[in-house]
């Protein structure tokens, strides 16, 4: 049986989409040293080549892709978006605005000076900043009529310019950002590792990049005379066993009666005590504990140790430092802190925000007691609240259709901004009401990534027909301008952060990468800093930058 592959793909558009996706995703995994192309650029290049070979698809049919992508970006940003001004929040906002304003300004003036075709500049800026939301915002402005297409062009040609500009500039933006992270500290005679250690010393951090996470274990001992001498008649609160060793006494059996002790309890000879703590904490126990006989008793040791993810919700907790939680009072152990899907260093001085996820372990009732105080335990259900997901999606589209009039000027926000706002609202409500709008993180990631890939396939197949013609005509100009737009804003942001805001270098570099939404460069900075301290800065700017980049794409295409 003979199979005409070309005819098969031409007659089966769904098959064509997934063939392009499969090839593009495989292509995106290619590495050049430590540099990986990534899914977005792999799928875009593949779809451009397939488009050049004559395969086509109605790009408008795949606009659902960018809608889902930008909606999911809003949901992820929602829990932390309104808390962006806590502590260093104003610094992160200033850095994000520095990158945004300088990039838009440079792109606008340079593209007009160079006479670039309509759409090329927005695509170039999206690639130079490795910021797909710029591309999404620009296309939505075209779809909604916010941007006016020149008379000598049509929508397909503008879409072609967007995708070609993005494809040519993306690698320039990625490579230049990585080189910035490597070279600028050396040129400024700074050591990111030293800067990270400085923050660690100031805030009482450990080396979270090398930290291992264990569940607490339980050991039981019979109180002997040596331990009684050591306690010297002090109660448990005065002894401060947790502060000294990291263990706490969960149960006491006295005269055959089991009890949960409070801080006023005083140990007596013959008591049997169950201690909970990490293995290394048990090793730090005073020898007086171990001099008594270790007890192996089911009733005494029968404690249910759990590990839960607690989402910060309480207004009384948001805005406070991690150290203010005083976990020792609850007998709980903190394993990690996650914000905006980025694991944060174990910073006792970090200011908590709504939506932060604390991974906590300990005895079940104690962990649940802590959760009731600060928020709620994250739902481990695999079921998504599709009703809320779809309802807010509809609200976002409806909001984007609302037309506002100022004098003789009328405009609508468009789907991108409308869906961003509805997504942020859903994410914020989810952080405050655990039973509402729940979407498993894995499902959210899949919808977001698949939506972005559909978007890339659509614009690539539509624009691929004249890609090599564009490369020969404006390739050098686009690459040169992309280098300028990629480098100058981050240098300006560095100068503002270092000399005006006087930020720590490790935090500053993480914040700049977050403002550039360049996740691949984050690994480079963490490697150079030998720590995850820069993630504090990255998480501070990433959420706000995603929103601003979408608006930047809309603004730039309108001004072009």
UniProtKB/Swiss-Prot annotation:
InterPro entries: AAE_transporter, RCK_C, RCK_C_sf, Transp_YbjL_put, YidE_YbjL. It is a multi-pass membrane protein. The keyword Transit peptide does not apply. It comes from Vibrio campbellii (strain ATCC BAA-1116). GO terms for molecular function: monoatomic cation transmembrane transporter activity. The chain crosses the membrane at residues 8-28, 37-57, 66-86, 91-111, 164-184, 386-406, 409-429, 450-470, 478-498, 505-525, 539-559. GO terms for biological process: potassium ion transport. HAMAP family: YbjL (MF_01015). It is found in: Cell membrane. GO terms for cellular component: plasma membrane. This is Putative transport protein VIBHAR_02636. Pfam families: Asp-Al_Ex, TrkA_C. Its main location: membrane. Residues 205-292, 293-376 form the RCK C-terminal domain. Belongs to the AAE transporter (TC 2.A.81) family. YbjL subfamily. PANTHER family: K(+)_H(+) ANTIPORTER SUBUNIT KHTT, TRANSPORT PROTEIN YBJL-RELATED. Keywords: Cell membrane, Membrane, Repeat, Transmembrane, Transmembrane helix, Transport. It comes from the Bacteria.
């Amino acid at each position: 049986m003979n199979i005409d592959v070309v005819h098969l793909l031409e007659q089966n558009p769904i098959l064509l989409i997934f063939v392009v996706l499969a090839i593009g995703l495989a292509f995106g995994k290619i590495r050049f040293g430590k540099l990986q192309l990534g899914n977005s650029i792999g799928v875009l290049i593949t779809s451009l080549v397939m488009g050049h070979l004559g395969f086509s698809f109605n790009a408008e049919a795949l606009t659902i892709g960018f809608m889902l992508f930008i909606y999911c970006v809003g949901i992820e940003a929602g829990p932390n978006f309104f808390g962006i001004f806590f502590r260093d929040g104003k610094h992160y906002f200033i850095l994000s605005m520095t990158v945004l304003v300088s990039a838009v300004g440079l792109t606008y003036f340079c593209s007009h000076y160079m006479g670039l075709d309509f759409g090329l500049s927005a695509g170039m800026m999206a690639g130079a900043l490795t910021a797909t939301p710029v591309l999404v915002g620009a296309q939505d402005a075209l779809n909604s009529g916010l941007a006016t297409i020149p008379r000598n062009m049509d929508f397909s040609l503008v879409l072609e310019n967007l995708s070609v500009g993005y494809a040519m500039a993306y690698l320039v933006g990625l490579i230049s950002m990585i080189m910035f992270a490597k070279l600028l500290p050396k040129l400024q005679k700074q050591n990111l590792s030293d800067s990270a250690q400085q923050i660690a010393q100031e805030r009482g951090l450990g080396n979270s990049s090398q930290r291992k996470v264990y569940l607490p274990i339980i050991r039981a001992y019979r109180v002997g005379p040596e331990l009684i001498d050591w306690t010297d008649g002090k109660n448990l609160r005065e002894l401060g066993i947790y502060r000294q060793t990291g263990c706490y006494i969960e149960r006491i059996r006295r005269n055959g009666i089991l009890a949960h002790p409070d801080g006023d309890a005083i140990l007596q000879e013959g008591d049997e005590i169950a201690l909970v703590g990490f293995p290394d904490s048990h090793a730090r126990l005073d020898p007086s504990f171990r001099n008594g006989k270790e007890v192996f008793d089911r009733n005494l040791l029968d404690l249910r140790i759990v590990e839960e993810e607690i989402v910060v919700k309480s207004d009384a907790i948001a805005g406070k430092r991690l150290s203010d939680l005083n976990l020792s009072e609850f007998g709980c152990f903190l394993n990690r802190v996650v914000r905006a899907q980025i694991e944060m260093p174990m910073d006792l001085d970090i200011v908590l925000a709504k939506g932060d996820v604390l991974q906590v372990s300990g005895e079940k009732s104690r962990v649940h007691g802590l959760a009731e105080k600060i928020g709620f335990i994250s739902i481990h259900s695999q079921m998504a609240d599709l009703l809320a997901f779809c309802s807010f999606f509809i609200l976002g589209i409806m909001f984007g259709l609302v037309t506002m009039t100022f004098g003789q000027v009328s405009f609508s926000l468009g789907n991108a901004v409308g869906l961003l706002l509805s997504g942020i609202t859903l994410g914020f409500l989810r952080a405050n009401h655990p039973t509402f709008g729940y979407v498993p993180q894995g499902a959210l990631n899949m919808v977001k990534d698949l939506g972005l890939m559909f978007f890339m396939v659509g614009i690539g197949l539509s624009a691929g027909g004249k890609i090599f013609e564009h490369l020969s005509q404006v390739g050098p100009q686009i690459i040169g301008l992309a280098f300028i737009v990629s480098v100058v804003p981050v240098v300006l942001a560095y100068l503002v952060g270092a000399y005006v805001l006087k930020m720590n270098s490790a935090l500053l570099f993480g914040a700049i990468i977050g403002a550039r939404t360049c996740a691949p460069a984050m690994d480079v900075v963490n490697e150079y800093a030998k720590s995850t301290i820069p993630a504090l800065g990255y998480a501070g700017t990433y959420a706000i930058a995603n929103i601003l980049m979408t608006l930047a794409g809309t603004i730039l295409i309108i001004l072009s």
